[in-house]
A protein has these predicted regions:
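Calycin-type beta-barrel ligand-binding domains and close structural analogs
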Residues: 2-8, 45-176
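Short, solvent-exposed loop/turn segments that connect beta-strands within catalytic domains
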Residues: 14-15, 30-33, 65, 157-160
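Short, solvent-exposed loop/hinge segments that bridge or flank secondary-structure elements
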Residues: 4-32
Length: 176
């Protein structure tokens, strides 16, 4: 899961998709309460201005073929964390108890027969407030070489108000 990812090829082939870069870096590697990752996403044209910054905590799921990805928001001014993925020890100064859990936004991933991890948020559980949205949905498929992520937001009537309407963003791993 850690590494640098880009959907540049997808964006070139289909103008409906913005070109996005995603960085995932391990943080707090000495902790024993799961694998912690700092995740930063930026438009390729504005790499120094990420539009999404999160912390993921990956813990064991209900069985040997599942994990739960707990999603957290960072506290305070997000600009102070921009580019943290470049550091040897990202977010070292931040303590996990300062993170803000995104209630209802956890993703349970299950390992399928093809060795892909597949999962999604629970329907109507992840609250959202931007673009007139009431809730958001995320679907994820991960392999060793790519992450497919389909984030969509809906208003209180169930009409989609943001996110791709045609399918997931396909991020290809560009480096570790």
């Amino acid at each position: 899961m850690t590494g640098n990812y880009s959907n540049e090829a997808q964006a070139k082939a289909d103008a409906k998709f913005d070109s996005i870069v995603m960085h995932m870096r391990p943080i707090w590697v000495d902790r024993i309460d799961g694998l912690w990752l700092y995740v930063e996403q930026s438009l390729s044209a504005t790499l120094d201005k990420p539009y999404r910054q999160r912390v993921y905590q990956i813990v064991d799921g209900n069985d040997a073929n599942s994990v739960e990805v707990r999603i957290y928001e960072l506290p305070g001014d997000l600009a102070q964390y921009a580019g943290a993925w470049k550091k040897d020890q990202p977010l070292r100064q931040l303590m996990p108890d300062l993170l803000v859990p995104r209630a209802g936004c956890n993703v349970t991933l299950r390992l399928d027969d093809s060795k892909a991890w597949i999962g999604s948020t629970e329907p109507n559980q992840c609250s959202a407030s931007s673009d007139g949205a009431s809730y958001s949905m995320s679907s994820v498929t991960m392999t060793q070489k790519e992450i497919q992520s389909w984030d969509r937001s809906y208003d209180s009537k169930g009409s989609q108000v943001s996110g791709s309407t045609t399918g997931p963003y396909i991020f290809i791993k560009t480096s570790r």
